[in-house]
């Protein structure tokens, strides 16, 4: 895969020890579970989990919703998963963010799967972009989506599961469209693409 810009801020990145194999076995791990782990292992676990799971390459999406009072809101997310084909369910994993405050009101969200040439869109909706023009939206089934995306998936929120410091928003798919093209990918804290 080819490498492009690395993100800063709160996005997954490479650790100083990236490239060296790192042990995934916690010191002093016993059948007693997490309580037996050392304080150091526990305090470094979030960073190391980001680094480890950052090696799981993903696509990049923009989640959108529309609120009567506030209009369209969008955010970049790669914590997106196909959960079930019948019934058709997907999930989006959200941390503390504005989207998570708006979704209980709208009860619906759209997933735009970004194409290789939409890195600037991903940066913008992650709050890290420098767009000079406001992004346009296209509407389908009453939900806004990003034009130029490879797929549009519209969902009604069917279930909500708090999970640690995130919440899993399970959506029942109401409509979907897709086209062929190269995807935008995210790997080890960087946007990239197919080789
Ligand atoms: C590759 C990647 C994957 C990520 N995956 C996840 C994930 O799975 N889960 C997670 O919780 N976080 C994820 N994030 C982080 C997340 O994108 C940011 O924390 C984001 O800022 C959260 O958005 P928000 O809802 O809090 O809204 P804001 O931070 O308020 O909005 C995000 C940005 O979108 C712009 N924006 C929103 N609506 C509009 C509009 N209608 N018109 C124009 N601009 C608009 C805002 O101006 C802002 O710049 C990811 C970030 C990256 C880079």
What are these regions (language model features)?
Residues 2-195:
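Basic, polyanion-binding surface patches
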């Amino acid at each position: 895969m080819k490498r492009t810009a690395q993100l800063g801020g709160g996005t997954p990145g490479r650790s100083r020890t990236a490239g060296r194999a790192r042990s995934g076995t916690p010191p002093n791990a016993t059948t007693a579970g997490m309580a037996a782990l050392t304080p150091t292992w526990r305090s470094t676990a979030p960073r190391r989990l980001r680094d480890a799971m950052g090696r799981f390459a993903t696509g990049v999406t923009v989640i959108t919703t529309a609120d009567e009072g506030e209009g369209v809101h969008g955010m970049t997310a790669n914590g997106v998963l196909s959960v079930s084909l019948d019934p058709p369910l997907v999930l989006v994993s959200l941390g503390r963010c504005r989207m998570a405050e708006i979704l209980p009101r709208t009860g619906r969200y759209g997933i735009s799967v970004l194409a290789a040439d939409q890195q600037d869109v991903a940066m913008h909706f992650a709050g890290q972009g420098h767009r000079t023009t406001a992004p346009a939206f296209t509407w389908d089934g009453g939900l806004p989506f990003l034009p130029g995306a490879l797929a549009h998936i519209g969902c009604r929120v069917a279930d909500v599961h708090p999970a640690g410091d995130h919440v899993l928003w399970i959506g029942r798919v109401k409509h979907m469209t897709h086209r062929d093209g190269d995807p935008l990918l995210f790997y080890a804290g960087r946007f990239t693409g197919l080789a």
